[in-house]
């Protein structure tokens, strides 16, 4: 039996299928050991010897390999064919050697693609380990350790908020910071262009002025509006004819197949993938045997692969799309190693594979590789110059025509944007056939103003390209370097562009000031050259390390001796031109804008650097590092914005794929009736036939929190009013929304007949009448609701029984009027004041609403001629409702009857009442608007437990802590809204059909799907992760047997070296109150500004040392608290007195809670629990019988209460 060892289980499964029964294939699951994070792991004084430590979570993997080796005849190391793969094989070999398990026959095989042919060929041609590659790995690992382990402790002690520094990551961060400084220092320059729209042979085109008054125009030649208008005038008045036509053929060649770098760039541009996501997908495709090895600098393809590609092109297209000779490519990137093929599909006949993001990436790789062997595209580029009669002014137009598409039929490479590239979109226009002497029609001439733009911020694609161009890092490390910058919160992503955070800018400034050489682009690229020389056997790895360490060590010792205050002062001077720029107005840029006497300076704080006034604490003016002149006071809440009014009850919001805020429970315009114009008469809401009248978003006439009636009637707000007050009906949140009044018992009016007095609406009021069928009043027309798409303008509505009443609204569309009627002819008198029921209960009654705009007045007549109905202006764009009730008991009419002896008295009373009502309505509306704004306000605050975000005010406010990896000063409304929306639903799992939830807990961000959890690396990943990445994360967690809850907390997150105090391993654990470190005897919680991922061994030792020095007083306090508790339980006679004193105890608990709600992200819960316990026990001792019958659980509760009550309280 032969044992084959590879890195991953997927690769092992594929290879085992090809090799057959004579082989056993096991996976090491990546690296098996590394340098421990402790002093002495690399010893420069002993030839840079290294001490390795096995990963604790790989113990069972190693055990499986060791057991299998014992039963095998030979060992075949088949890890990846690069520096890291060679290192993994070397580590396995060294480990087996130390345990004396190494078999006699050890071979190394490599293959660029996991296909049957490649694997069997590799097995037939084994080799030995490549010592040059191993030495290059050792040199790189030692360099990273020496830089990181030496610089990071300096940062922790001298630079608040800094987490780590690295040989490559710090240089990549400098690129981002330098670009940001370019943007900030950029001064836009105005320039103008003059263009003319022309036409010939019915084909339009645009020409640009390139020569004016005999001078050739450059981009910035026309600098102001005056010049532009003069040039525009000359073009308008000139007669232009074609003076020159130049046509030349152009060929475009395809790009070579992907390297690691170009794959990351193109996947970011075309697919929007992060570099790390691209590499995870490519790794999976490689292990499944679908593509070749994905970590490569090479652009060449194997001859057999080229032949397969040319065959596929011929089959899919025709012979004209295949070049005469196969295309050969050579890499142009700096520090490239062409040991491996380019990234290509293993089978060109397969144009689709896998699913989701895997399929999208595979298709991109397949198209690029196939197009690289296709024929060139043939184009014809034409340039036409048009000159006016003076010969001084020249217009130019450029166009091109594709004669043969060639490879463009299949693939065209994307390009990064260029802010100042105005010609990028030119040159592709279709031009008419123009000859010398032709005079195209001049249609319009325009002068356009422009401003030069700063260079764009780096995207992942452009940052990778820049790193590749400068020779910084290796293509295989680009993704991990960028991910570290994001995980450390040194950069943030905004619209897929990198912006340096305050911590990132401060770290870069520190390194530039004190370690400028080691973060220079040339020095870093030079180190990469040295590593390549080691890989090729042309340099000694120990000499390279010695040359580096000889200068680096003294520099770090020099900086370590300086005090933090001196470091901050140096940075203050170094950053002065940026932090306090001189505006040239004679004003001191360091003068405090708040007190005007203090001077601003750079200070260090818990969350990093900031600008503060020298008069602190008298003046509390501060501003963020790089924030500008608008400072803040951290003691005051900072308003970030307002939530939309139609967010759901909890303030949770939904987000689009681009991160835009979407109301969680909004329906479409067709569903709600809300149009762009603002108002529709009706809105249908979810429920069993429920409908509600919908007006403006700023003043809903119904309570969205109240459930609608399940019988199909609108849920209404019933208000009972007395005297001459107006009774509310319909869909109203208060009595001012829809007011209806009726006067009854007017004898003078009844003798002469019905007098319908309608208080007219403000705009275009029509008239509506309602009559019975008893002949007492004629029916007039009514603009009825358009039901089922009906557009009838007039409708006569009658009541067969002669009894009209009000009910619930209909749900017809665009209804201006809705009539409320009863089938049984009875009036629901529940809302009628008691003193008027006798005069109105036996009468037929109806009322109508008259809105302010585009609605109708309504008058009502009845057979008894005793009721005078008034239509009162409602102030809303809602008409009258047409709905029938099934029974009188379901009717929701509100009728207020006002007895009077004269019509004039009624009119005066109504006018006075309307004035008062209008004023009170305005006050109430203003109050409601103010309360609504407070409830929707999103603020950033700082409380006892740190910074947090709050939505609303008071005890009902929603709060969420600012995550540890987010700088509180950088939280804007968009980020705050997304944090408040957590946890969020990502989508249904394609296998289980269960919802995947992304949230954050005591252990940080996580994914949850049907009780299965997966960790997320950062808040950014929590907010941005999509369904495909979430499924991959959950699968990886299941594969790694990740556990959650109590089980997870029992296993260490990270194991450091042995403690110098206890000589036991120092471990990072998950505890009940969050992550902590332990050395077996002392436990120390992590500070809030330290993430578990960034914690190093030195930090852990410092935390444990500080915790061990702290006095232990908690146990003494607990013992003292138990003594009065015992006395109180035995003193039964004092129980009645407790009832009087305990009324004050809940008050203190309430006060604590209120303080927590207003000032802290996490309300204090323990005082509330004590208050409940005291109230319970205070009542029970009052009755002796109750005390005797009390079970043991109540006695325990009484004991707990007595413990919480001081002795002097009982005495009172």
Curated annotation (Swiss-Prot):
Domain Toprim: 1-114
Skewed-composition ranges (Basic residues): 1109-1140, 1167-1182
Sequence segments annotated as region (Interaction with DNA): 164-169
Any single Gene Ontology cellular-component annotation: chromosome
InterPro entries associated with the record: Topo_IA (IPR000380), Topo_IA_2 (IPR003601), Topo_IA_AS (IPR023406), Topo_IA_cen (IPR013497), Topo_IA_cen_sub1 (IPR013824), Topo_IA_cen_sub2 (IPR013825), Topo_IA_cen_sub3 (IPR013826), Topo_IA_core_domain (IPR023405)
E.C. number(s) listed in UniProt: 5.6.2.1
Keywords: DNA-binding, Isomerase, Magnesium, Metal-binding, Topoisomerase, Zinc, Zinc-finger
Domain of life where this protein originates: Bacteria
Entry function: Releases the supercoiling and torsional tension of DNA, which is introduced during the DNA replication and transcription, by transiently cleaving and rejoining one strand of the DNA duplex. Introduces a single-strand break via transesterification at a target site in duplex DNA. The scissile phosphodiester is attacked by the catalytic tyrosine of the enzyme, resulting in the formation of a DNA-(5'-phosphotyrosyl)-enzyme intermediate and the expulsion of a 3'-OH DNA strand. The free DNA strand then undergoes passage around the unbroken strand, thus removing DNA supercoils.
UniProt-listed HAMAP family: Topoisom_1_prok (MF_00952)
Full protein name: DNA topoisomerase 1
């Amino acid at each position: 039996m032969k044992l084959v060892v590879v890195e991953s289980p997927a690769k092992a499964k594929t290879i085992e299928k090809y090799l057959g029964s004579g082989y056993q294939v096991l996976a090491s699951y990546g690296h098996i050991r590394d340098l421990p994070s402790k002093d002495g792991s690399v010893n420069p004084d002993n030839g840079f010897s290294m001490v390795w430590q096995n990963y604790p979570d790989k113990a069972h993997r190693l055990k499986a390999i060791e057991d299998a080796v014992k039963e095998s005849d030979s060992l075949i190391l088949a890890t990846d064919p690069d520096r890291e793969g060679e290192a993994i094989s070397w580590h396995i070999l060294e480990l087996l050697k130390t345990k004396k398990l190494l078999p006699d026959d050890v071979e190394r095989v490599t293959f660029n693609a996991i296909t049957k042919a490649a694997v069997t060929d590799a097995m037939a041609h084994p080799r030995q380990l490549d010592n040059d590659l191993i030495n290059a790995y050792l040199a790189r690992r030692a360099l990273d350790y020496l830089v990181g382990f030496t610089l990071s402790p300096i940062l922790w002690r001298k630079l608040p908020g800094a987490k780590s520094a690295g040989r490559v990551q710090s240089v990549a961060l400098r690129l981002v910071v330098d670009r940001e400084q370019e943007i900030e220092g950029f001064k836009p320059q105005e320039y103008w262009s003059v263009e003319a729209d022309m036409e010939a042979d019915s084909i339009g085109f645009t020409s640009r002025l390139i020569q004016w008054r005999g001078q050739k125009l450059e981009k910035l030649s026309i600098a102001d509006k005056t010049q532009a208008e003069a040039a525009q005038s000359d073009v308008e008045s000139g007669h232009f004819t074609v003076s020159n036509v130049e046509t030349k053929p152009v060929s475009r060649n395809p790009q070579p197949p992907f390297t690691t770098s170009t794959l990351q760039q193109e996947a970011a541009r075309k697919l929007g993938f992060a570099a790390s996501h691209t590499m995870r997908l490519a790794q999976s495709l490689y292990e499944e045997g679908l593509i070749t090895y994905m970590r490569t600098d090479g652009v060449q393809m194997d001859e057999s692969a080229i032949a397969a590609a040319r065959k596929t092109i011929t089959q899919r297209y025709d012979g004209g799309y295949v070049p005469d000779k196969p295309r050969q490519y050579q890499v142009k990137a700096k520090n490239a190693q062409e040991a491996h093929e380019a990234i290509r599909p293993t089978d060109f006949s397969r144009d689709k594979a896998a699913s989701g993001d895997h399929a999208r990436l595979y298709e991109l790789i397949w198209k690029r590789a196939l197009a690289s062997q296709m024929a060139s595209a043939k184009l014809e580029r034409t340039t036409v110059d048009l000159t006016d009669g003076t010969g001084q002014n020249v217009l130019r137009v450029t166009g091109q025509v594709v004669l043969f598409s060639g490879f463009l039929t299949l693939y065209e490479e994307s390009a990064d944007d260029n802010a100042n590239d105005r010609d990028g979109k030119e040159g592709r226009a279709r031009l008419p056939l123009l000859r010398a002497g032709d005079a195209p029609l001049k249609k319009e001439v325009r002068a356009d103003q422009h401003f030069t733009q700063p260079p764009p911020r780096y995207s992942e694609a452009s940052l990778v390209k820049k790193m590749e161009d400068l020779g910084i890092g290796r293509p295989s490390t680009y993704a991990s370097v960028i991910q570290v910058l994001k995980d450390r919160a040194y950069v943030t992503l905004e619209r897929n562009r990198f912006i340096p955070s305050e911590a990132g800018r401060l770290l870069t400034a520190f390194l530039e000031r004190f370690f400028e050489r080691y973060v220079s682009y040339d020095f870093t690229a030079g180190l990469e050259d040295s590593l390549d020389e080691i890989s090729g056997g042309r340099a000694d790895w120990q000499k390279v390390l010695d040359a580096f360490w000889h200068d680096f060590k003294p520099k770090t010792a020099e900086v370590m001796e300086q005090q933090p205050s001196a470091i901050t002062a140096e940075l203050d001077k170094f950053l002065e031109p940026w932090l306090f720029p001189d505006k040239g107005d004679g004003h001191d840029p360091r003068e405090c804008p708040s007190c005007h006497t203090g001077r601003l300076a750079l200070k260090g704080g818990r969350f990093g650097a900031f600008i503060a006034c020298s008069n602190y604490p008298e003046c509390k003016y501060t501003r963020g590092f790089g924030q500008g002149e608008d400072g803040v006071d951290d003691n005051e809440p900072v308003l970030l914005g307002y939530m939309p009014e139609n967010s759901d009850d909890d303030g949770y919001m939904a987000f689009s794929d681009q991160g835009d805020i979407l109301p969680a429970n909004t329906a479409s315009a067709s569903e709600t009736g809300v149009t762009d114009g603002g108002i529709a008469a009706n809105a249908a809401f979810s429920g069993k036939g429920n409908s509600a009248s919908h007006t403006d978003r700023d003043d809903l006439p119904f309570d969205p929190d109240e459930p609608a009636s399940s019988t199909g009637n609108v849920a209404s707000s019933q208000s009972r009013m007395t005297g001459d007050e107006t009774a509310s009906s319909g869909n109203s949140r208060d009595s001012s929304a829809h007011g209806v009044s009726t006067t009854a018992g007017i004898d003078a009016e009844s003798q002469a007949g019905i007098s319908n007095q309608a208080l007219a609406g403000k705009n275009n009021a029509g008239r509506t009448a309602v009559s019975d069928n008893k002949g007492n009043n004629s029916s007039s027309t009514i603009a009825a609701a358009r039901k089922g798409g009906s557009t009838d303008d007039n409708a006569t509505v009658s009541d067969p029984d002669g009894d009209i009443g009000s009910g619930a609204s209909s749900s017809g569309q665009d209804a201006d009027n809705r009539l409320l009627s009863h089938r049984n002819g009875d009036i629901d008198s529940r809302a009628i004041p008691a003193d008027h029921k006798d005069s109105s209960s036996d009468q037929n009654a109806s009322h109508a609403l008259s809105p302010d705009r585009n609605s109708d007045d309504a008058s009502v007549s009845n057979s008894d001629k005793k009721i005078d109905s008034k239509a009162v202006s409602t102030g809303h764009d809602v008409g009258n409702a047409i709905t029938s009730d099934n029974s009188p008991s379901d009717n929701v009419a509100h009728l207020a009857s006002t007895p009077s002896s004269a019509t004039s008295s009624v009119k005066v009373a109504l006018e006075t009442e309307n004035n008062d009502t209008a004023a009170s309505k305005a006050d109430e509306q203003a109050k409601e608007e103010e309360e609504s704004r407070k409830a929707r306000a999103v603020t950033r605050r700082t409380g006892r437990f740190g910074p947090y975000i709050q939505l609303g005010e008071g005890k009902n406010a929603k709060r969420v802590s600012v995550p540890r990896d987010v700088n509180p000063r950088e939280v804007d409304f968009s980020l705050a809204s997304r944090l408040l929306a957590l946890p969020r639903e990502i989508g249904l799992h394609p296998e289980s059909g269960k919802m995947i939830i992304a949230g954050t807990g005591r252990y940080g961000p996580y994914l949850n799907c049907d009780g299965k959890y997966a960790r997320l690396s950062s808040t950014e990943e929590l907010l941005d992760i999509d369904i495909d990445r979430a499924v991959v994360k959950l699968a990886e967690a299941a594969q790694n047997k990740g556990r959650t809850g109590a089980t997870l907390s029992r296993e260490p997150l990270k194991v450091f070296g042995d403690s110098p105090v206890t000589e036991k391993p120092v471990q990072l654990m998950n505890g009940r109150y969050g992550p902590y470190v332990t050395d077996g005897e002392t436990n120390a919680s992590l500070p809030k500004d330290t993430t578990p991922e960034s914690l190093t061994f030195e930090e852990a030792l410092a935390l444990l040392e500080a915790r061990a020095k702290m006095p232990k007083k908690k146990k003494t306090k607990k013992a003292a608290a138990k003594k009065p508790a015992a006395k109180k339980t035995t003193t039964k006679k004092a129980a009645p007195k407790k009832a009087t004193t305990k009324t004050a105890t809940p008050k203190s608990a309430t006060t604590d809670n209120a303080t927590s709600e207003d000032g802290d992200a996490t309300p204090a819960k323990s005082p509330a629990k004590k208050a409940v316990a005291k109230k319970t026990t205070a009542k029970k001792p009052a009755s002796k019988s109750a005390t005797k019958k009390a079970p043991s659980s109540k006695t325990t509760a009484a004991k707990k209460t007595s413990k919480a009550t001081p002795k002097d309280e009982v005495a009172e």
